[in-house]
Amino acid sequence: MKCEMTMKPTRRTILAGALAPLAARLAAQSPARPIERWDRFELQLAGPAEGNPFLDVRFSAEFRQQHRSVQVDGFYDGGGAYKVRFAPDAEGEWSYVTRSNRRELDGQTGAFLSSAPSARNRGPVSVRNTYDFGYADGTPYFPFGTTCYAWTHQPAARQQQTIETLRQAPFNKMRMCVFPKWYTYNQDEPPVYPFPRSAQDQNDYTRFVPEFFHNLETRIAQLQSLGIEADLILFHPYDHWGYALMPPEVDDRYLRYVVARLAAFRNVWWSVANEWDLVKGKKTADWDRYFRILQESDPYGRLRSIHHSGPMYDPTKPWVTHVSIQGDDFAKIPEWRAAFRKPLIFDECKYEGNIPKRWGDISAREMTRRFWLGMANGAYMGHGETYLDAHDILWWSKGGVLHGESPRRIAFLRGIIESGPAEGAAPVTGAYYPCIARAGEHYLYFLDFHQPALADFDLPGGRFTAEIIDPWAMTITPAEGTFSGKFQLKMPGKEMLAVRFRKT
């Protein structure tokens, strides 16, 4: 006869049984590995798919570490999936609790560990020392950007080709549109639209298409892996689908959705518009509102700018972090630095190319000259390329491959700038030739079109070595001896040279 014994439940076993589902849920909601500081933690929960979750469901989370609390908006990703992304800015344990107007999404709790960043993770870029930029870990960041407006709206193979081109290119910032673009050399339908679109070309602005944003996120992550900042253009006038003419409430909802999805990527910058003054139907008050939405919705304070065609949007407004400039009036750099007291980036100083447009037909030599002249006056520069192509595959719009000769020269300049003072260099007021310097330590002059056989210089006390730099030939030639005070330096007598002095 078999005898079975039944154990009487204890308080401990009852409590363990009650907590088991909670423990399992927390384990499922916590990452298996720590999240690096400044990287992305992502929580995904299952929720309602019926109705219109984009409008009907509110979802967010509060992240806590000791006395700190950070509120982060979540978003609906389709298929009943709700996500919230968070980029921890401190190491250690973080806890969270979700908030929602739907019971199944509300009050979900969990925790994760933030670990030390890896060697390639320097954190997000922000303004430092008024006119410059730096990574969160203290490393200086000198922007050397390029433009590919519609590269993420191309066939997948071309998008990947663009990534492979960038892998070998000198650029560490990419200007790119969120919305597709319709303009000369770029009149193609995108593979996916940001909003559902009917056969009659009507947009359903009450919903988003998650697949559109999945692709964008993949490309932003690839840029991050290459050390490239993604300068995302949120609005532009070159429209074919109605995105430049959306009602105000749709504009606002779009901005909040984009911030919820993308702000946790540490390499994201916000460019509120490309050529803001050409976007018809929007007033200055609208652009002010967009900036305020970014400020209020973005818990990380990513960099914010706005690009112009003619008149600038007022760069002194507090929500503008740096000045995005179209043009080549480098003589105004000292005036703008004094007036705006913010970093200046000539994101568009015209493009290397040969198209029948004045903005897209400068030579590689002239692009190289503009990079040197702008930087020697205290600004940062941006590249673009517009060479005619039988299939209209121009880098400036669609990406693909680079054909020009300026990128190699830009790489050469970037190496010179990044090997300079870690604290950066400032323009020297009243210098005979444009010059940026770390006073008493390091001087970089650009002689532009001047071609002296003997060049006059005036350095402070101490001794300095001199090097003659040819930006086009990409050579650095040491001069014999050391120099101090007022003197003449023997030069090759050719234009577009630079001279670097470093204290011995």
Describe each region flagged by the PLM.
Residues 29-67, 72-75, 113-116, 434-435:
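Non-catalytic, glycine-rich low-complexity segments
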Residues 67-73, 473-480:
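Surface-exposed loop/edge segments in extracytoplasmic proteins
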Residues 72-128:
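Extended acidic/polar, glycine-enriched regions
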Residues 83-86, 485-491:
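Exposed aromatic-hydrophobic patches
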Residues 122-332:
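Active-site mouth of glycoside hydrolases
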Residues 317-390:
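Catalytic-core region of carbohydrate-active enzymes that cleave or remodel glycosidic bonds
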